[in-house]
Swiss-Prot record:
Residues 270-289 have a biased composition (Basic and acidic residues). It comes from Debaryomyces hansenii (strain ATCC 36239 / CBS 767 / BCRC 21394 / JCM 1990 / NBRC 0083 / IGC 2968) (Yeast). GO terms for biological process: mRNA splicing, via spliceosome. InterPro entries: CDC5L/Cef1, Cdc5p/Cef1_C, Homeodomain-like_sf, Myb_dom, SANT/Myb, SANT_CDC5L_II. This is Pre-mRNA-splicing factor CEF1. Involved in pre-mRNA splicing and cell cycle control. Keywords: Coiled coil, Cytoplasm, DNA-binding, mRNA processing, mRNA splicing, Nucleus, Repeat, Spliceosome.
Length: 668
């Protein structure tokens, strides 16, 4: 039976480098591919080596005392849960286990009162040390994945050389089999396409047209998703004509304006709008009530959680006092204790090393004791007096009371209400048009005064809008109203009596509109707006007369001539006649009038105009030049005169000085 070789063992430096290169190429998921490059290691061992040692995120620095203390406290809280402890400390689980074992072994050598080995934990970390525990010859190397790599030998084995060469060849090949096959297929398709194009070009040169499409009819009818766009809607070419839409919109607007002008806005729309507003107000009110209810429930939950936290609080356990009254010397004696000495002693008394030693001893003591399940006589458990937890009904009543007290305190802060009740009575004008309320308003006595007034205000606004629609069309369309004095007087002798009446009525209406909307100071007789009944009667009479009138029907004329040979011959003969007439008229004009004389006079006039333009241009240039020279001369004259004035002033000053000197000399 051949020997079975088990993969594993110490990791060498060559294997580590191969593993790093393989991870950089294959990633952190294809461990079977990575392990295929390593002859003596499996996929699980390769993954463990990367996660335990080669990962650059691993902290391999020396353990600090704070980390040791944290490790011991976590080992006490989470026994044997090293996978959970490792991410909290920031190291691997294996390193945590080894450090924990090292700390337990170090406590065997340290006495309870001895201080000679206090600094034993300051040496190198577990990473640079051999396996923990007492190692003997022949012992197994546990967790080789978390140990440093074995250095390479100068003369490597043939097996290692073969593994290194194979890994180098495979890792250098960045293009796999699939990529090579795809590239080869693309090259074949390109060569086929080029050969087909060459064949088609040769056949076309020979006079034979061959299509590149498939010859299969079924295949040819399928949709080509590479060539075409599915569900494509092509827009119309050029500018889109929207004249029809604009005309339809205009007609619809005119129809609506006519309907409103004749019938007015129906009250049903106003009622629906008012009903919609009431529904929205009710909905907002309900939402506000729901929100307040939710806030109350949230406040109740907060109170409940707070009470639960208070119930869960445990009794505060303080450490035993270090100094008692018996050991403390009396005040004022020579052996009294200084306060500063006590504070420094208390602060340095329990250092980090002492805490680490205490924690390790306690852990070892717990490991030494047998389980309570295996012991014959179980130790008596001290009875602790615990406060009974209140029932759910009591808790519910308690937080309800707290919420009610909170609400009462908030309501108590509100200001006192002002009960000033007043009734606003509507004032009615006797000349005003009577407004009929709806049946709902008249019959329902439960509607309050504010709602009734609001309905009356809506009806009043509706009447105002109807009154605006009964004005003249010029005012409704906001057209400019001309001044009455700018109107032209018509000739009464040439117009009929009906036209004269229409003109007078139009003038009176124009004066009234001008005084109402343009110039209130303009004095004229104002015309009151028609009431709704008169307006309806007038519109009915106009529509009745329009219905009785016969509308003139215009026959549509075609702008195209019939396309026949007879019509074409008539058009050609007509064109010949027009051509002969135009030539005869041209000959008669040329015979009676000397055209050359007109051309000569035209040329002379153009020449004179050109000469005058040139002279005008030169005169303009000279004028600009002389103007510029004048400006420069004025500036220079001003500067020269200023300079000469300064010289004269200097001469006068010098003359005065000389005269003073002469006077002084004469006096001396």
């Amino acid at each position: 039976m051949p020997p079975i070789y088990v993969k594993g063992g110490v990791w060498t430096n060559v294997e580590d480098e191969i593993l790093k290169a393989a991870v950089s190429k294959y990633g952190l998921n294809q461990w079977s591919r990575v392990a295929s490059l390593l002859a003596k290691k499996s996929a699980k061992q390769a993954k463990a080596r990367w996660n335990e040692w080669l990962n650059p995120n691993i902290d391999k620095s020396e353990w600090t005392r704070e980390e040791d203390e944290k490790l011991l406290s976590l080992a006490k809280l989470l026994p044997n849960q090293w996978r959970s402890i490792a991410p909290i400390i920031g190291r691997t689980a294996t390193h945590c286990v080894e450090r924990y074992q090292k700390l337990l072994e170090d406590t065997n050598d340290v006495g309870i009162e001895g201080d000679e080995n206090d600094l034993r934990l300051s040496g190198p970390g577990i990473e640079s040390l051999p396996a923990t525990g007492t190692s003997h010859v022949g012992d197994l190397n546990i967790n080789p994945e978390s140990k440093p790599a074995k250095p390479d030998e100068e003369d490597m084995d043939d097996e290692e050389k073969e593994m290194l060469s194979e890994a180098r060849a495979r890792l250098a090949n960045t293009q796999g089999k699939k990529a090579k096959r795809k590239a080869r297929e693309r090259m074949l398709e390109e060569s086929k396409r080029i050969s087909l194009l060459q064949k088609r070009r040769e056949l076309k040169a020979a006079g034979m047209k061959v299509s590149l499409e498939s010859k299969n009819k079924k295949r040819r009818q399928e949709f080509d998703y590479n060539a075409d766009i599915p569900h494509e809607h092509e827009p119309q070419s050029g500018l889109y004509d929207v004249d029809e839409e604009n005309e339809a919109n205009r007609l619809e607007r005119i129809k609506f304006e006519r309907g409103v002008a004749k019938e007015g806005i129906p009250l049903q729309e106003v009622d629906e709008k008012h009903k919609k507003q009431k529904q929205e107000a009710k909905k907002s009110k309900d939402d506000g009530a729901k929100q307040t209810q939710m806030s109350l429930e949230a406040a109740a939950e907060v109170f409940h959680e707070r009470e639960q936290e208070i119930l869960k609080r445990r009794k505060l356990d303080l450490p035993a006092p270090e100094i008692s009254l018996d050991t403390q010397p009396p005040i004022g004696e020579s052996g009294s204790i200084n306060i500063s000495d006590i504070t420094t002693k208390d602060s340095n008394q329990e250092g980090i090393d002492d805490r680490i030693l205490k924690a390790t001893r306690e852990l070892k003591r717990n490991q030494a004791t047998k389980s309570s399940l295996l012991a014959e006589d179980t130790p008596e458990i001290k009875k602790e007096t615990l406060s009974k937890e209140p029932t759910s009904s009591k808790l519910k009543s308690q937080w309800k009371k707290s919420v009610l007290n909170l609400l009462k305190s908030y309501f108590a802060k509100l200001p006192k209400p002002h009960n000033d009740i007043g009734i606003i009575l509507p004032s009615y004008d006797p000349n005003e048009e009577p407004i009929t309320a709806s049946n709902e308003m008249s019959t329902d006595s439960r509607v309050d005064q504010g709602e009734r007034l609001r309905n009356l205000e809506i009806l009043r606004q509706v009447d105002e809008e109807k009154a605006k629609l009964r004005r003249s069309q010029a005012v409704q369309r906001e057209l400019p109203i001309p001044k009455p004095s700018s109107l032209q007087q018509i000739d009464t002798s040439k117009c009929s009596k009906l036209d004269l009446l229409i003109f007078n009525e139009m003038r009176t209406l124009l004066n009234s509109d001008y005084a109402k909307y343009e110039d209130p100071t303009f004095k004229t007789n104002l015309i009151d707006d028609l009431d709704e009944e008169s307006f309806g009667i007038v519109n009915n009479e106009i529509s009745g007369e329009l219905m009785k009138m016969e509308s003139a029907k215009v026959s549509p004329k075609s702008s195209h001539l019939p396309k026949t040979y007879e019509m074409a011959e008539q058009i050609i003969s007509k064109l010949h006649e027009l051509s002969s007439e135009s030539s005869s008229i041209e000959n008669s004009i040329s015979a009676n009038i000397n055209i050359s004389a007109f051309n000569y006079r035209e040329n002379n006039a153009l020449q004179n105009i050109d000469n005058l333009y040139n002279e005008l241009n030169r005169a303009d240039i000279e004028l600009k030049g002389y103007t510029k020279m004048l400006q420069n001369e004025e500036i220079s004259i001003e500067s020269r005169s200023k300079y000469l004035h300064e010289l004269v002033d200097d001469l006068v000053d010098n003359e005065h000085l000389l005269e003073e000197k002469v006077r002084m000399l004469r006096r001396t």
